[in-house]
Structure formats: structure tokens, C-alpha cells
Amino acid sequence: TIISSTNYSKSINKSPVRLQKSTGNCLYQERILLYMNYDSVPLRDFKELNDWETVIFVYQSALKQVETKIDILNGEFQHRHKYNPIEHVKSRIKTPESIIKKLKRHGYESSIENMVRYVNDIAGIRISCSFTSDIYLIADMISKQNDLTILARRDYMKNPKKSGYRSYHMLVTTPVFLSDSIIDTKVEIQIRTVAQDFWATLEHKMHYKFEGDGPDYITKELRECARYVAELDTRMEELNNEIQKYGKLSDKK
């Protein structure tokens, strides 16, 4: 049976899969309950906590699968070309607080069905690379994986956000094989240079510090810094190309 992510909550209700309550899962449940009590979100909106637990388990499994795939692709590239396009890979599962806030911000009730349908970045992977050309190289390698389905792409490299944010986003689904079913699960992949990642981390902190409404002078300064980062990436790319040309000429001698 192949289950679409849009019918996720229905399939999980029917699934006999249940996780043993480990310390980590108990802490996760406590965070959900604490936040729900604090924000007056009724418990009935989440159905059973066991369902939530199973959903998170499936997203964690999807994250592991995509991470492993990226690691293999990077290793293969090193094996064939003696070069690693990927510098760092980070992954995370969105916290219950963030999921609930995002649903409320977009006017949706806090339910498992809405969570799965409308929150595309519950499972997220961030890939940092040295050069802008690596971004498209990595995106191309990921796109060629037959067991991944590309749902959407957003090229903020060519079309930066107003804030100055630059990155390349891919929304994919990967099949998670359970004992009695296959669940197509969404994972968001962000690819950017190390310099862009440094800038984005600072911008992200400011966004949440000021709840998206920071002082004008800070916003302006960040936008200016984003321009410098873009210029730096361009110069480093050009310098790398010159180094590669020099290396090829040296090999011929």
C-alpha cells in the first residue's frame, strides 16, 4: 500500500505501528502538552499523542534516508572526481512549538492532518557548500534520484528575497517503508554556500528575536551584508576557477 502524505493522518490512525515510550519520546510529548496548555490549544485537536509520536517517527525516518543518500552522493563524487562539493550537512525535525505557531500564523487549526498537509518543512536538511556552482551541482544530483519525487523548487539564488536571503530550496518526498505500508514523506532541502549560511543564521535569529519586525537600521544593514556575501561568493568562485585552470596547465607540463 502506498500512502500519500496528504492522507497521512488517516493512514496512521489505521496503522498498528506504535513506538515504545523512550525518554526522548516522553520529553517530546511533555513539550507538546506544555505548549498546548500555555497557548490554550485544545488536546482534542491532536487526536491521540500516539498518533503524533508515529508521525514524528516517520519524519525522522525520512530524514535519515535522505541524509544517507546525500552522504553517499558526496562520497561518490569524492571517489570519482577527488572533490567534495558538500562542506556540512545539518538536519532537524521542527519542534511542536514551531509547528503549532506556523499553523496558527496561516490560519489553520492545530491538527495532525493540517500539520502534514500544510507544514512542508517538518523534516529539514541544510547543505552547505563552498561555491555557488556547487549548489546547482548538488541539486542536480539529488534530482536524478529515482526514489525521490521533487514537489517544488525555489531558486533564491537567482531571485533573492527582499531581506537579501539567498539559497536553493527543494521540497521532495521519499518513501518510508513500514512493516505494513509505504508512506511518502516530505523533506525540505536547503542548499547554500558557507557564507550564505552564516548570513542566514544571523537573519533567522533576528527574525525570531523581533518576531519578524526588526528595527529598520538592522534590516538595512543585514541587506547590505547580504550584498557583500553575494560579492564574496562571486569572487571566490572566480578565484577557484583560476586555481582549477592553473592546476590543469601544471598537469600538462
PLM regions with names:
Residues Q65-R80, I86-E97:
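Small/polar-rich, solvent-exposed N-terminal microdomains that initiate assembly or binding
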